[in-house]
Amino acid sequence: MIIILIFLIIPNIVLSIDYWVSFNKTIILDSNITNDNNDINGVSWNFLNNSLNTLATCGKAGNFCECSNYSTSLYNIAHNCSLTIFPHNDVFGTPYQVVWNQIINYTIKLLTPVTPPNITYNCTNFLITCKKNNGTNTIIYFNINDTNVKYTNESILEYNWNNSNFNNFTATCIINNTINSSNDTQTIDCINTLLSSYLDFFQVASYMFYMIIFIATGIIASIFISIITFLSLRKRKKHVEEIESPSPSESNEEEQCQHDDTTSIHEPSPREPLLPKPYSRYQYNTPIYYMRPLTQPLNPSPLPKLCPPPKPCPPPKPCPPPKPCPPPKPCPSSESCSPPESYSLPKPLPNIPLLPNIPPLSTQNISLIHVDRII
């Protein structure tokens, strides 16, 4: 297929033509010389390979074109001086030129088959894009509901549709060349797409809402537990301080007892520890003993069990015979003895009077009361 880009109207204007041909095909380049042209001298075919080289020199006489100095294995020149190029590897990308009363430049390009295009659309901008994948010398046609609305020979076709007229429609992109044709069809449905985007947004928002509720609940629960712990520790501390510190009445009793006779025995307070206080109320848990007169009678002790009868004693062993006494020693000569010392009686002990209300210690029932310290 020959595509003429610039038509020759005025003489001596260069005409450029892109010639698309598939691989291993014979190429025919038209000289644009007709039978109306009379004898023409100086027709030449040239090719450009880093420099302009002459391929053949021809002359036309009547309906016959005669040329010389060209390779018949690669080229052939017809009666109207058109050039036929047989398939070979160096033909693509090589410019050819025919010169006579006018100049025509040919560019040989390889024609390749097309593959299905890609269709994409954007519901925000209402834009449809049709893009070519493979193929040369192609034309792209775009149809909406089997009606052609646009075409181009570029690689990308873009179309903005009217949202008021089209909401749910079928878009078809067709791409073809002289070798083959291919197409792709998409259903454009922006209503469902917008709804799905809204649903996705609401789903994400719900996830965020539940996450915020979960975090806020955890923070509130932590604050509530901290307050309860603080109040319980404060109450416990106050309770321990009340136990360790005596009441005002007990303090008065202790002061009154201090003014009494030091020999008197006073009743200890139930909260008065007889052991020294620990350095810290959390240091250790030590039982504290208090002495208090027993107000209730003691439980009667059970009767002792009867002892078994004594076992009979074995008969006594016979005594050995007595040893003879030694003879008495002679008494020393008597000396005058000193008169014995007179004996003085010991001094009587002082009589310490006891308080009339307090019986002697021997008559008091004293019990030990076990009190655990509360921590």
Swiss-Prot record:
One GO CC term on file? virion membrane
Residues making up the signal peptide according to the UniProt record: 1-16
Determine the domain of life of the protein's source.
Answer: Viruses
Give the primary localization class: host cell
Record has Ligase as a keyword: no
Intervals, Cytoplasmic compartment: 229-375
Q: Identify the glycosylated residues.
A: 24, 80, 105, 122, 134, 145, 168, 176, 183
Q: Known InterPro entries for this protein?
A: Ig-like_dom_sf, Ig-like_fold
Here the disulfide bonds are: 123-190, 130-173
Provide this UniProt record's keywords sorted from A to Z.
Disulfide bond, Glycoprotein, Host Golgi apparatus, Host membrane, Late protein, Membrane, Receptor, Repeat, Signal, Transmembrane, Transmembrane helix, Virion
List the biased-composition ranges (Low complexity). 332-346
Which regions are flagged for Basic and acidic residues bias? 256-270
Keyword Transmembrane helix present in the record's keywords: the answer is yes
The UniProt entry annotates sequence repeats at 305-310, 311-316, 317-322, 323-328, 329-334
Transmembrane ranges? Answer: 208-228
* SUPFAM superfamilies, sorted: Immunoglobulin (SSF48726)
Instruction: Spell out which residues lie on the membrane's Extracellular side.
Output: 17-207
| PTM entry text | Cleaved into two fragments of 63 kDa and 26 kDa containing respectively the glycosylated N-terminus and the nonglycosylated C-terminus. A full-length 89-kDa glycosylated form also exists.
Kindly summarize what the UniProt induction comment says about this protein's expression. Expressed in the late phase of the viral replicative cycle.
Q: How does it sit in the membrane?
A: Single-pass type I membrane protein
The written remark on domains in the entry is: The C-terminus contains repetitive amino-acids that may function as a cell-penetrating peptide.
Which protein is depicted? CD2 homolog
